[in-house]
Amino acid sequence: MTQAATNSAGTFAPLRQKVFAVLWVATIIGNTGSFIRDVASSWLVTDLSATPAAVSMIQAAATLPIFLLAIPAGVLSDILDRRKFLIVVQFLLASASLCLLFLSASGLQSVTSLIALTFVGGIGAALVAPTWQAIVPELVSRPDVKGAVALNSLGINISRAIGPALGGLLLAWFGAAVTYGVDVISYVFVIAALVWWRRQVPEDDALAERFLGAFRAGLRYARASRELHVVLLRAAVFFAFSSAIWALLPLVARQLLGGGASFYGILLGAVGAGAIGGALVMPRLRARMDADGLLLLSAVLTAAVMGVLSFAPAQWVAVAALLVCGAAWITALTTLNSTAQAILPNWVRGRTLAVYLTVFNGAMTGGSLAWGATASAIGVPFTLAVAAIGLLSVGFAFHAMKLPKGEADLIPSNHWPEPLTSEPVEHDRGPVLVLIEYTIDKADRSEFLKALARLSHERRRDGAYGWGVTEDAADPGRLVEWFMVESWAEHLRQHKRVSKADADIQDDVRRYHKGPAAPVVNHFLAINHPHLG
């Protein structure tokens, strides 16, 4: 078997698992309906108001809710039944499209109603996105997770190839009401697939997280993960500049290229078709380039496409350029998504992917508004040229900030012993102070502190909100590491969160310990008493 055939088989291997295959097909249908709706709304706003600011507001209305709500949605995806949660949200999205159908059929549609209902659709997307990504490990075996992530991206772009073109044709032939009606029907398939799925619900866990605690834990993890910071920064700069093409494409189609609704759909369909092609050749690209090279290639190609469009080329040239844009877009998106997935443990995946989605959509929202305002001031062609130059500049400038490899073993190690207590401790009691006492030779002190600094990031990622190290004034070789956890339950969760990679870091720290026994660990609980103030 050739390497290409092996790569292809690996790409589609997750579809051999029935539940994943059914939900994957259903999401393609649902996303196709969403793209049909978005094409109708984006084009209708150019009929109602042709100003760049109004057109870019549609893009902003779709992405702003994800920026605002993705993190709370990620928390919900980690603490609720994901299947039931998705079903409720699909009904919300269907209701928004029903309202668009009614307003269009009755002739009451306006820029305000389009933006408002697009915002509601964005709320639904914000609630769905981290949940769909978080359920992937439930649907496939561990070796197939990366392939399933890539297939999710491929599925979205199959929808992007079909939906916009179909939406443009439906809008041109039958009008907005029928177009929105097709979107409503698409949700029926998604809801049916979710109802059919018999998800294995985890048993009730006495340590199950509550919303606010889970929210804080997710933010603590994101704040302490340096690898995630690199992914977020690389994503932010790429999407902030590349968002110009999405914010201004309706105006490019209508004003620069002289096309109608069906041509706009063809342009978006070209993006999707290019993305499908890009997804199919990505295994070969990955064999030749690392993640940083793929992201730089995406930036160069996207900038080139914006440069071509700024010259108002012939329509066929624009279609060809957007085929390239689609391939570049899925390359960047899949590279960043798979990197984020690879560095996140299961317990915090939904929440932390939501942080990534927040940055992604924040960059898209802010970029869309900024490029819309810029186009109002200097025109669409010059704005595209400025965005292209900016994307090239940041692409090369940030290339030296290498993306993480995602090779750490994040499976829970379960190597921490149960804490010793004189009697059972109530789960909500806290805060908890944990002390670990080491005996360190003077010659090893510097290397020990370096290893301990690496361990501090693991402590904070897994739940600590304060961390430090102290020494005994009478015995400088006696060092005490301490960290604070907000409750006893949260500390018990730490025991479950520590990964095998974290265990390796802890082993590196403990090899400097020279005591006759293992480092002594003590747990101190806060005392709440009226005389203590």
Question: What does each of the following model-derived ranges do?
Answer:
Residues 52-53, 142-152, 261-262, 346-355:
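Loop-to-transmembrane helix entry/capping segments in MFS-fold secondary transporters
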Residues 117-158:
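Cytoplasmic helix-loop-helix junction between adjacent transmembrane helices
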Residues 7-64, 220, 224-270:
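Helix-loop boundary and gating motifs at the non-cytosolic
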Residues 404-406, 457-466, 484-521:
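An amphipathic, aromatic/His-enriched active-site/gating alpha helix that lines ligand/cofactor pockets
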Residues 42-49, 101-106, 162-182, 251, ...:
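Transmembrane alpha-helix termini and helix-breaking/packing motifs in multi-pass membrane transporters
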Residues 58, 68-72, 79, 83-85, ...:
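C-terminal transmembrane bundle of multi-pass solute transporters/carriers
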Residues 23, 109-117, 230-231, 316-322:
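Short hydrophobic/alpha-helical segments at membrane-entry points of transmembrane helices
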Residues 134, 138, 180-210, 288, ...:
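Helix-loop junctions on the cytosolic side of multi-pass membrane transporters
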